[in-house]
Each structure stands twice: as structure tokens, then as C-alpha cells.
């Protein structure tokens, strides 16, 4: 079965167009101002205009304040909420209040970090645990040791993220069996600027994995 793909941190019409044309399944927009990939709700709504079902729009939020996600939803109907630096209890509160699927990020550095259950959210995004001095919770081009996923066969939905590129993603899919892969910095020409050619190469590599 071919893994599904999320292209995250989209902030240009060209990157959105390349993602759609290349066959991405999820298109992600970052609503975290410190990120070089951040967009406003209005910018995301304009960029998302060409996106139609079954493609899904994912909004990434980092420890959001009360009302922050709702403010975005008033401009752009998202299909999935992706949460970073949010405890399980808070994630479940948001899931119930927003009535939308929630993906929760989990930092992975070693096998002991692998989750045993989803905690009640719709999927867990397994990303490399950021370094203590990292300014961002993800999108740092950092991978964890995929070999620890060799026997990982959870009953819940999960996504592989962290350090994926067009050159590494096929091997990552083969080694981990990831049902969904998530890329951001791995398809950028410079920090925060997506390269449509790299997006196309990444999507092609996943299809041929």
C-alpha cells in the first residue's frame, strides 16, 4: 500500500500547486508566528482556494491560546488540527470543542519514547525530539533512528515526520511501514521557502517506494 503524504508549511501558490499536481493527500499550513513558514489565516485561506476534497487541509498550531484555532477556522475551514507542545488532556478538550480530527505530535529520540496508545486523539505524529535549544518544535530537518520502528505496529493511526527528503523517504517508508509521511524542510530551497521541484520529487519517491 502506498503511503499517504502531507506537505507541511505551505506558504506560496506555487508550492500548493505542486503539492496538488503531484498527488499529496494532506496540505499543511503553519499558524505559529515564530516559524519561517507561518501564514496568517487570511493568507492560508487564499492559498487554499484551489484545494478540494478528497485533499485535506491541516492546520498546525503550537500550544494555542484559547480562541486561536477558532479565529483561523472563521477564515479557513480546516479538515484536521495538528497540535505541538500540547498535553493529551488539552488535545482532547480541543478535539471535543472543535469537532475536528486532531493529530498530536510526539517527540521521539529513543525506543522508550514510542507511544503505547494514542491517548484518544485521531493520530500521532512521530517527529524527532527537538534539541533543547531548538526554536521550533518541528520542521528542523532532524530525523530519529528509524530502526526503532522495525517492530512498531500500533493499533492507532500514526504519521512519520522528521528529516525526510526526496532521497530518504522511500527508504524510510520501506523500513518503517509508515502509513503517512510528513515533510517540510526536506522540500525547501532555503529555510521557509518550498521548492516545487523538490515537492514533485518527494511525491514521486513515495509512489515508487
Curated annotation (Swiss-Prot):
Pathway: Amino-acid biosynthesis; L-tryptophan biosynthesis; L-tryptophan from chorismate: step 3/5. Its EC number is 5.3.1.24. SUPFAM superfamilies: Ribulose-phoshate binding barrel (SSF51366). It is an enzyme of class 5 (isomerase). GO terms for molecular function: phosphoribosylanthranilate isomerase activity. GO terms for biological process: L-tryptophan biosynthetic process. It catalyses: N-(5-phospho-beta-D-ribosyl)anthranilate = 1-(2-carboxyphenylamino)-1-deoxy-D-ribulose 5-phosphate. Keywords: Amino-acid biosynthesis, Aromatic amino acid biosynthesis, Isomerase, Tryptophan biosynthesis. Belongs to the TrpF family. HAMAP family: PRAI (MF_00135). This is N-(5'-phosphoribosyl)anthranilate isomerase. It comes from Granulibacter bethesdensis (strain ATCC BAA-1260 / CGDNIH1).
Amino acid at each position: 500500500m502506498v503511503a499517504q503524504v502531507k506537505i507541511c508549511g505551505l506558504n506560496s501558490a506555487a508550492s500548493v500547486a505542486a503539492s496538488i499536481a503531484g498527488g499529496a493527500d494532506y496540505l499543511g499550513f503553519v499558524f505559529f508566528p515564530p516559524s519561517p513558514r507561518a501564514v496568517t489565516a487570511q493568507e492560508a485561506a487564499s492559498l487554499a482556494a484551489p484545494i478540494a476534497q478528497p485533499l485535506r487541509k491541516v492546520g498546525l498550531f503550537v500550544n494555542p491560546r484559547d480562541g486561536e484555532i477558532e479565529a483561523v477556522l472563521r477564515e479557513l475551514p480546516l479538515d484536521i488540527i495538528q497540535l505541538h507542545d500540547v498535553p493529551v488532556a488539552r488535545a482532547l478538550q480541543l478535539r471535543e470543542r472543535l469537532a475536528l480530527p486532531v493529530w498530536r505530535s510526539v517527540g521521539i529520540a529513543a525506543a522508550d519514547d514510542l507511544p503505547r496508545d494514542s491517548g484518544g486523539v485521531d493520530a500521532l505524529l512521530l517527529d524527532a525530539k527537538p534539541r533543547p535549544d531548538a526554536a521550533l518544535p518541528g520542521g528542523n530537518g532532524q530525523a530519529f533512528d528509524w530502526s526503532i520502528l522495525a517492530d512498531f505496529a500500533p493499533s492507532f493511526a500514526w504519521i512519520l515526520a522528521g528529516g525526510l527528503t526526496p532521497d530518504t523517504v522511500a527508504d524510510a517508508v520501506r523500513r518503517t511501514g509508515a502509513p503517512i509521511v510528513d515533510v517540510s524542510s526536506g522540500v525547501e530551497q532555503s529555510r521557509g521557502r518550498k521548492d516545487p521541484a523538490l515537492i514533485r520529487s518527494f511525491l514521486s519517491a513515495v509512489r515508487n517506494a
